[in-house]
């Protein structure tokens, strides 16, 4: 019976796709395919276990080609890396609900039957497909090393699709087949007669565990949503086409490394694929929604946000050459920094042995007065408003160091698959050839989270703090290596540690948390910006350099706007404007590393002059460019796509950065920023901006920064959940979550905010606490449980003190007559009780927008569908009574109702639902549909949980964007509802 239902569903789905007159590139699907579908995605598995369909239901494009879904590799005593192909196996396939299951009760390789079992699941979720896997190995003397799953083999790509990888923060390749199909730098070291491969390993200079194929209006997202952060390769292969001989049979997927021995099992349910509609920002939001379930990034110290650039300078080099002395710190080094508006020094080679020498001894340089003299110079430097960042290497152990020779080095270092120490060599040279070719330094590599090594790192951190530095920095801890992992050689087969990212994350968290409360402004930095590691850093040093034609860090920057990280690679006067402009466009800080840290910026006069100009602009518009939020292309329009343009949003202003990075001749563009008025602009080179900020003209590598002041109004709603509730919850009691609520309010920066479930004490304490943090609101609260409206269980409204003047509020009850307090909500099936429900209205005059007036109703509406529907008219009656001038009208609150409920349908006859307003432009809806999270952010996101609404009414009211902000704080929600807000442009 189920089989018939699936086939009928298949026919229905495909007919619907064709009926929409959409793109339909798919070949005929096998009659026996197993199908799952919703309004966004269709996925089907053939009876033979192939991927028969992976369709975007909105566009009709099918990315699948009935190709291979998985492969596996195992080792035996006689041979390594023996391949098992899914296409050679016979699965039992079944469907149950939204899950297709493939069971392989035995496997065959080269005609030999193996006692190994594989179970694969394909689960259709709202906006993606999740691919799960479970392995059982009962084959004696074998180990399953590698699983490639899921695979989209023979991927069918639209012509406009480009390949995005997260290498070095992000690269975008116009021709996926061309870049993947290239032969490697060591031809045929791999079996390239069969396929070509682009090597991309998460964490190994790859910032995110996702990649994608992005078109203008649709794309295919691949994400390994794996909170173990185990080794994951992004499978990018081009197989040889037997018909043409070309390497154009594209395959995309994920590679995992189970190392599953005989008698063991292994599972993974982390890999997802999402055909999506819209721009690449949709894919970014999918990844960020997953990241929010584990993200634990503390509030970055303000001085770090305000850091425009740093000078990275080696004082004493590896081979003993002294480049600068402690005296120079407050002399020519600081003078060079000040000449370009740089007030931070990233200090290398400050110890006796010199840079990349003697780790982890870092002996005091007694020839200069030791640590006492260094501490004195640091204090002088920072007393002038500067910041010193003190360098250590987080993993390298010099084999000539006292630490290594004491016997500690061999105990804590990593070992390879033979049990030998893993070594690294650094080939810095003098002016001859001897050092680099013959006498380079040799380092062992420490094992992360070894207790003995942890003590070393903590001791170094303490030393930096005691020296008075504003930050401690650990080199090479913000990423993992491709190869130098630690091996366990005690088993039948040697096994590498595949949890390198996890252990470095634990190490960085340990270091961060040691000073988080005691000295919150003492910053922690690391080299590399892998997301799982960067969450524990206050800033990161960009690695590797990424400044070629494929550079495209837009995706990473948009996904992680809160991170502070630098560029890398500009070391002289070559190609300065283009490189520096990139850092402004992408919100990076400048890593000033003249001649690879051997000199200071006064030795590069072209760079010095240009950076001085750019840093002056950064300082002038610091509220946006340094402290603001990167918002990519949102909030404005630019008429010329040939010019790069980005938005940075501050509390009250927006900066639009426009640059001519193409190297082409002079180009004009027109800039429009709805809901804002132009204030001023600054340019580099011969750039020009019209007096009203609408026209920009830029020559080769010119840049303009235009600043606009907000005239829009941000109106939202936030159910705070009563303080008396959740007292027994370790994480969500009021005292624990209050700092999260404050941080959430600061992040949303709402001009007008309706709030619900506010008890008496919090009606005073919360606005006061927000004011202490720089967000000053006036407020009004109404309790429907008291005749005079004063008391607990209240809902209220907050408005910015310096922007609005309030009229007289009027409260009411959601019943007939509205002036009489009475029980008017008898609950629903889950909650049976007697509630008093009400609301209030108020008029606010906008002092910033020429005295424009807004009429606002705030409510916490009935749970009972019947009671709610019966009395829904009360709100519109109140609006008509108290808004005779027909002012722009906003109706906000926790409605305890879905959009499909009768009451919601009634409200839409009078007001417009701001969420539904963007049905024709869903790219301007941010965050999940669901607003009620029930403290379960990883599970509850769907539209049925949208119960908090922002309605509007008025011909001159235009919503600019809708946001349901599911940001977590230390992995936790601030309330059991997400805040919801809408930016409105209100014409007067």
Language-model features, listed with the residues they occupy:
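Acidic/histidine-rich helix-loop elements
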Residues: 715-738, 815-833, 862, 939
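N-terminal, active-site-proximal structural segment of metallo-dependent hydrolase catalytic domains
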Residues: 710-772, 784-793, 852, 987-988
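Structured beta-strand-rich core segments of catalytic domains in phosphoester-bond hydrolases
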Residues: 752, 756-853, 964
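Active-site-adjacent "subsite" loops/lids of carbohydrate-active enzymes
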Residues: 321-326, 373, 390-464, 553-556
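Conserved structural scaffold segments of CAZyme catalytic domains across common CAZy folds
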Residues: 91, 106-108, 112, 137, ...
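Active-site-proximal substrate-binding groove within the catalytic cores of carbohydrate-active enzymes
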Residues: 264-271, 502-685, 698-708
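Polysaccharide-binding surfaces and accessory modules of carbohydrate-active proteins
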Residues: 24-42, 59-108, 116-118, 124-237, ...
């Amino acid at each position: 019976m189920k089989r018939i239902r699936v086939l009928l569903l298949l026919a229905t789905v495909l007919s619907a796709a064709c009926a929409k007159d959409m793109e339909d590139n798919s070949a005929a699907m096998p009659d026996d395919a197993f199908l799952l579908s919703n309004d966004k995605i269709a996925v089907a598995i053939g009876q033979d276990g192939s991927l028969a369909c992976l369709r975007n239901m909105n566009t009709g494009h099918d990315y699948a080609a009935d190709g291979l879904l998985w492969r596996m590799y195992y080792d035996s005593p006689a041979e390594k890396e023996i391949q098992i192909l899914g296409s050679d196996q016979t699965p039992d396939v079944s469907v149950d609900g939204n899950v297709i299951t493939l069971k392989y009760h035995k496997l065959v390789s080269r005609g030999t039957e193996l006692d190994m079992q594989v179970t694969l699941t394909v689960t259709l979720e709202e906006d993606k497909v999740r691919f799960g896997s479970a392995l059982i190995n009962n084959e004696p003397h074998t180990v399953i090393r590698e699983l490639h799953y899921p695979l989209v083999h023979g991927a069918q790509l639209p012509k406009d699709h480009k390949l995005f990888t997260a290498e070095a923060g992000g690269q975008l390749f116009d021709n996926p087949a061309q870049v993947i199909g290239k032969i490697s730098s060591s031809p045929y070291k791999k079996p390239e007669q069969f396929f070509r491969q682009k090597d991309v390993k998460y964490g190994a200079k790859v910032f995110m565990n996702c990649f994608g194929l992005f078109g203008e209006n649709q794309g295919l997202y691949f994400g390994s949503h794996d909170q173990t952060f185990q080794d994951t390769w992004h499978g990018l292969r081009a197989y040889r086409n037997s018909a043409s001989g070309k390497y154009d049979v594209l395959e995309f997927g994920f590679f995992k490394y189970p190392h599953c021995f005989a008698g063991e099992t292994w599972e993974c349910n982390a890999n997802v694929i999402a055909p999506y509609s819209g721009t690449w920002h949709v894919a970014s939001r999918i990844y960020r929604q997953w990241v929010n379930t584990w993200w634990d990034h503390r509030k970055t110290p303000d001085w770090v946000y305000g850091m425009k650039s740093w000078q990275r300078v080696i004082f004493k080099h590896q081979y003993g050459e002294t480049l600068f002395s402690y005296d120079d710190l407050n002399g020519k080094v600081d003078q060079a920094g000040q000449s370009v508006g740089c007030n931070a020094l990233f200090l290398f080679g400050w110890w006796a042995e010199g840079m990349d020498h003697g780790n982890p001894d870092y002996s005091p340089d007694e020839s200069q007065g030791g640590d006492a003299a260094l501490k004195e110079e640091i204090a002088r430097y920072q007393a002038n408003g500067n910041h010193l960042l003190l360098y250590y290497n987080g993993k390298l152990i010099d084999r000539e160091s006292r630490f290594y020779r004491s016997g500690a080095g061999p105990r804590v270092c990593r070992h390879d698959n033979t049990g030998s120490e893993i070594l690294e060599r650094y080939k810095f040279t003098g002016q001859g050839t001897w050092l680099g070719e013959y006498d380079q330094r040799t380092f062992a590599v420490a094992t992360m989270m070894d207790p003995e090594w942890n003590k070393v790192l903590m001791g170094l951190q303490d030393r930096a703090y005691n020296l008075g530095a504003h930050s401690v920095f650990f080199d090479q801890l913000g990423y993992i290596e491709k190869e130098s992992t630690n091996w366990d050689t005690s088993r039948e087969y040697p096994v590498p540690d595949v949890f390198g990212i996890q252990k470095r994350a634990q190490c960085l968290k340990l270091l961060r948390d040691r000073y988080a409360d005691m000295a919150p402004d003492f910053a922690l930095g690391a080299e590399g910006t892998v997301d799982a590691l960067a969450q524990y850093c206050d800033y990161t040093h960009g690695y590797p350099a990424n400044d070629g034609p494929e550079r495209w860090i837009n995706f990473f920057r948009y996904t992680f706007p809160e991170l502070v990280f630098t560029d890398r690679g500009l070391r002289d006067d070559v190609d300065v404007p283009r490189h520096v402009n990139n850092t402004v466009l992408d919100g990076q800080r400048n890593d000033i590393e003249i001649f690879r840290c051997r000199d200071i910026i006064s030795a590069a006069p072209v760079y010095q002059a240009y950076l001085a100009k750019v840093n002056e602009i950064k300082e002038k518009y610091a509220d946006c460019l340094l402290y603001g939020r990167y918002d990519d292309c949102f909030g404005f329009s630019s008429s010329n796509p040939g010019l790069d343009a980005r938005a940075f949003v501050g509390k009250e202003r927006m900066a639009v950065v426009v640059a001519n990075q193409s190297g082409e001749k002079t180009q004009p563009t027109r800039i429009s920023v709805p809901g804002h008025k132009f204030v001023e602009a600054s340019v580099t080179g011969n750039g020009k901006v019209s007096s009203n900020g609408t026209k920009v003209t830029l020559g080769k590598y010119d840049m303009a920064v235009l600043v606009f002041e907000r005239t829009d109004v941000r109106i939202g709603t936030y159910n705070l959940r009563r303080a008396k509730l959740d007292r027994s919850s370790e994480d969500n009691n009021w005292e624990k979550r209050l700092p999260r609520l404050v941080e959430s309010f600061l992040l949303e920066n709402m001009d007008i905010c309706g709030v619900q479930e506010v008890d008496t004490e919090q009606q005073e304490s919360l606005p006061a606490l927000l004011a202490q943090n720089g967000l000053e609101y006036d407020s009004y609260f109404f309790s429907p449980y008291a005749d005079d409206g004063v008391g607990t269980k209240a809902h209220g409204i907050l408005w910015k003190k310096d922007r609005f003047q309030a009229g007289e509020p009027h409260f009411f009850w959601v019943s007939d007559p509205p002036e009489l307090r009475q029980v008017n909500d008898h609950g629903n099936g889950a909650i049976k009780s007697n509630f008093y429900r009400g609301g209030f209205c108020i008029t606010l005059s906008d002092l910033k927008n020429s005295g424009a007036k807004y009429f606002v109703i705030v409510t916490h509406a009935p749970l009972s569908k019947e009671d709610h529907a019966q009395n829904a008219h009360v709100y519109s009656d109140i609006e008509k009574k108290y808004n005779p001038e027909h002012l722009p009208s906003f109706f906000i609150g926790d409605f305890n109702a879905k959009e499909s409920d009768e009451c919601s349908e009634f409200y839409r006859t009078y007001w417009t639902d701001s969420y539904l307003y963007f049905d024709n432009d869903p790219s301007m809806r941010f965050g999940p549909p669901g607003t009620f999270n029930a403290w379960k952010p990883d599970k509850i996101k769907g539209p049925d949980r949208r119960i908090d609404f922002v309605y509007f009414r008025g011909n001159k009211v235009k919503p600019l964007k809708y946001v349901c902000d599911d940001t977590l704080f230390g992995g936790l929600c601030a309330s059991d509802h997400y805040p919801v807000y809408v930016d409105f442009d209100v014409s007067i």
